[in-house]
Swiss-Prot record:
GO BP, sorted A to Z: cellular response to oxidative stress
Primary role: Could be a mediator in iron transactions between iron acquisition and iron-requiring processes, such as synthesis and/or repair of Fe-S clusters in biosynthetic enzymes.
Keyword terms of this UniProt record: Iron
Organism: Francisella tularensis subsp. holarctica (strain LVS)
Name of the protein in question: Probable Fe(2+)-trafficking protein
Keyword Acetylation annotated: no
UniProt xrefs under NCBIfam families: PRK05408.1 (NF003817)
One Gene Ontology MF term: iron ion binding
Gene3D superfamilies registered for this protein in UniProt: Fe(II) trafficking protein YggX (1.10.3880.10)
Length: 87
């Protein structure tokens, strides 16, 4: 499997086997983010969708997730919703 130096975890890890999004952001994620970080984002994204009851048909919800994804993957910011508690 191909390796990348992951911007989130600051180490060389397995790459995502595909470009997860179209466009420049998708290329950036594919080239700079590991599969481990991408899987962590998918889990975090699920929390955000459920806790904020996001409707993914709405452009505003999609933009919110895109901003949160960038913060999570490239800026190291992983803020969970205030009302969220892990069981």
């Amino acid at each position: 499997m191909t390796k990348v130096f992951c911007k989130k975890y600051h180490q060389e890890l397995d790459a995502i086997p595909f470009q997860p999004l179209p466009g420049e952001l998708g290329k950036k994620i594919h080239n700079e983010i590991s599969n481990k970080a991408w899987q962590a984002w998918l889990a975090h994204q699920t929390i955000l969708i459920n806790e904020y009851r996001l409707n993914l048909i709405e452009p505003k919800a999609k933009e919110f997730l895109k901003e949160e994804m960038y913060k999570f993957l490239f800026e190291g910011k992983e803020e969970k919703p205030e009302q969220f508690s892990e069981i």
